């Protein structure tokens, strides 16, 4: 019994001792300092409550996250990513939800003259059954001596088909189908003169049409002119560029000229013959007044005769002829042009207005000016990262109009 009592007393003393008044003495030379203190009990629930009160609400933390997302941190971080998600829409894919990771980085963080490299990872799913994932980017090596531009993506898209040529897109009834598309493309460039590059391009693409809406009537075969519903092609080519743009995704000044010749060998696909494609781009950017950029774009693509339907030039996408259903007007060749005024309005918010035109045709000797289609529209911009914009455009065309939500400037 005495032992139990001693143990209980010892336990009580050990628990109560921290809360009892304690005396300490410090001696310094001939002086002695005596003091007595009593530790106060700590209320753990109050401390936790204060911590919870100091924690910002989710919405405020989200605002803080995006407030700093447009600051250039490429000199202090290996790669500076910003993540975003929200609704997406285009005339081709309808309403959906998109996720995006936009990153900026520098391979040489001691080089403050060269523009940073960029990469975008994206995923999208829509109520119409679209799903797509991919990555695209531009890697700029030290002192901009070399460049690597790349795109890797897969998409499954319910689409409409009108056939080939201006008259088909204008007057035919659409046939619905699902298009599965795989694309891998890389363009490696080497600087040979100031702002002048030459390089090679390598691409692989596979497209398959499935679930045609009129399979019983087989009228879609008329639109395909007897071609197969699936094609695979591997492209090899040469690129020559002149590029004085200050930043590829969103230039404020400079000129960009690109000429590319690509061949698709018969033995590296199932197209049945060797094909070729010629592409030309000419872009110019000039500041016209404070925070306002005037941008111009000329684009042309020419495919060889007998190019399969999935590889034809398709008018209307998130870069050119915005507002048209992509592929309603399709043919061997296409020429488009547009001029856009880009104005920063307040802090990270801006707006745009543009106008342009486009034409699809089978060959230059069959080009018809009366088949030229108009295009114009306006847009809203929000700076997600330093000079990387999220854009909402509304484009108008001939008997058509549509919203478009995307990332980076159209050109």
Features from the language model and the residues they span:
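Outer membrane beta-barrel transmembrane domains
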Residues: 303-391
């Amino acid at each position: 019994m005495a032992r139990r009592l001693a143990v209980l007393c010892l336990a009580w003393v050990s628990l109560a001792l921290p809360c009892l008044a304690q005396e300490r003495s410090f001696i310094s030379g001939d002086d002695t300092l005596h003091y007595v203190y009593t530790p106060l009990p700590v209320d753990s629930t109050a401390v936790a409550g204060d911590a919870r009160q100091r924690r910002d609400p989710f919405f405020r933390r989200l605002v803080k996250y995006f407030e700093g997302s447009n600051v250039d941190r490429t000199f202090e971080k290996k790669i500076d990513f910003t993540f975003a998600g929200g609704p997406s829409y285009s005339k081709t894919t309808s309403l959906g939800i998109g996720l995006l990771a936009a990153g900026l980085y520098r391979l040489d963080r001691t080089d403050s003259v060269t523009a940073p490299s960029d990469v975008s990872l994206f995923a999208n799913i829509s109520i119409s059954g679209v799903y797509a994932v991919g990555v695209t980017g531009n890697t700029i090596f030290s002192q901009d001596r070399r460049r690597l531009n790349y795109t890797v993506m897969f998409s499954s898209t319910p689409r409409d088909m009108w056939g080939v040529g201006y008259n088909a897109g204008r007057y035919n009834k659409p046939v619905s189908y699902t298009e599965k598309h795989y694309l891998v493309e890389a363009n490696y460039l080497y600087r040979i003169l100031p702002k002048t590059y030459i390089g090679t391009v390598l691409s692989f693409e596979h497209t398959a049409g499935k679930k045609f809406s009129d399979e019983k009537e087989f009228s879609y075969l008329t639109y395909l002119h007897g071609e197969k519903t699936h094609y695979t092609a591997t492209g090899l080519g040469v690129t020559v560029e002149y590029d004085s743009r200050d930043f590829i995704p969103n230039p404020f000044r400079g000129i960009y000229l690109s000429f590319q010749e690509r061949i698709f060998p018969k033995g590296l696909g199932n197209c049945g013959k060797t094909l070729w494609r010629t592409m030309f781009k000419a872009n110019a950017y000039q500041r016209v007044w404070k925070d306002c950029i005037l941008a111009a774009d000329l684009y042309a693509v020419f495919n060889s005769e007998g190019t399969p339907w999935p590889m034809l030039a398709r008018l209307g996408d998130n870069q050119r002829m915005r507002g048209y259903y992509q592929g309603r007007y399709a043919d061997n060749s296409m020429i488009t042009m547009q001029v856009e005024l880009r104005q920063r309005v307040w802090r990270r918010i801006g707006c745009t207005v543009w106008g342009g035109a486009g034409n699809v045709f089978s060959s230059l000797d069959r080009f018809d000016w009366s088949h030229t289609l108009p295009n114009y529209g306006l847009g809203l911009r929000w700076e997600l990262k330093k000079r990387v914009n999220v854009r909402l455009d509304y484009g108008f065309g001939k008997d058509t109009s549509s919203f478009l939500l995307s990332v980076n400037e159209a050109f």
